[in-house]
Regions:
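Phosphate/nucleotide-donor binding subsite
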Residues: 61-92, 96
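A polyampholytic, Gly/Pro-enriched intrinsically disordered region
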Residues: 79-90, 151-163, 216-230
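Short, well-ordered alpha-helix to beta-strand connector turns
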Residues: 25-29, 130, 174-175, 193
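Generic beta-sheet signal
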Residues: 3-7, 101-107, 132, 175-179, ...
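Class I SAM-dependent methyltransferase SAM-binding "motif I" and its flanking Rossmann-like core
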Residues: 111-175, 230-233, 247
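A contiguous loop/helix-start segment that scaffolds small-molecule binding in enzyme catalytic cores
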Residues: 170-255
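General beta-strand structural signal in soluble alpha/beta enzymes
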Residues: 33, 63, 107-109, 134-137, ...
């Protein structure tokens, strides 16, 4: 039986790789690296560095080009599903053509495979006989709260994890809202009683951290995001919106 490992590698710092993740890399015979283009070479470079550090020879690396997603399509969900299906075809070809029976393949997944990642959903579309295992990693959310030295949860309060697109459509539906990838800077629509903890390129040398009342730091975040995207050609950011308790606009209490 062919076997596939989905290995969470953390938010960007090589030190985010867990002991379990390092052992999983050492157990793999073949690695699939999905290239997102020249602008994101550093994403591929980190994966290669981790394989070189923890892989056991002889191993092979197979490369494939990530399919383009139509970001201008009016039907957002349909566009994402189409892109995911084409991603699934890449994985299916890798399993069929590059793995021999009894071999173990590996995908090194940014962050944690179980949070805001399409790999598991893509694997569900594959019609092939194989086993797979998920190795958890440090997510961008965990990295964000650690870097800002703030707890994700507060006593007796829910946390809502959403996207920038949904935040713009629905507004803040909880006192604590985590937003993944927000190209439109939808946090500007939060009320003046919200505090924001924002981070981009978490765990990398390019890491940017900004926090403060939304009304005071929104402009700084917009400017930093635009400059970083222009300089690098891409950006991955995450933030926590936290409503301050009555009489406290800092939003930093955890109890």
């Amino acid at each position: 039986m062919k076997r596939l490992l989905l290995i969470g590698i953390g938010a960007g710092d090589p030190g985010h790789l867990t002991l379990q993740g390092a052992k999983a890399i050492a157990a793999a015979d073949v690695f699939l690296l999905v290239d997102k283009g020249e602008a994101k070479d550093d994403l591929t470079r980190l994966r290669r560095d981790l394989i070189a550090a923890h892989g056991r020879e002889p191993y092979r690396i197979v490369e494939a080009r990530d399919p383009e997603r139509d970001r201008a399509a009016p039907a957002y969900t349909a566009a994402v599903e189409d892109w995911r299906s084409r991603r699934a075809q890449i994985y299916e070809s890798f399993i069929a053509d590059d793995l021999a029976d009894g071999q173990t393949g590996a995908l090194l997944v940014w962050g944690d495979p179980g949070l805001y990642d399409s790999t598991l959903a893509a694997l569900d579309e594959i019609d092939a006989e194989f086993e797979y295992e998920v190795v958890p990693g440090i997510s961008s959310v965990s990295a964000l709260t650690a870097r800002h030295r703030v707890a994700l949860t507060r006593v007796g309060r829910p946390v809502h994890i959403t996207t920038g697109r949904r935040l713009a459509a629905e507004g803040t539906t909880a006192d604590d809202v985590v937003v993944m990838l927000d190209a439109a800077c939808s946090f500007t629509g939060a009320g003046d009683d919200f505090h924001i903890y924002w981070g981009a390129y978490l765990g990398t040398p390019d890491e940017i951290l900004i926090e403060g009342p939304v009304t005071e730091v929104a402009g700084r975040i917009r400017a930093a995001r635009a400059e970083a995207r222009a300089r690098k050609g891409w950006i991955m950011d995450t933030y926590l919106l936290r409503r301050a308790p009555a009489g406290d606009r800092r939003g930093t209490q955890n109890g």
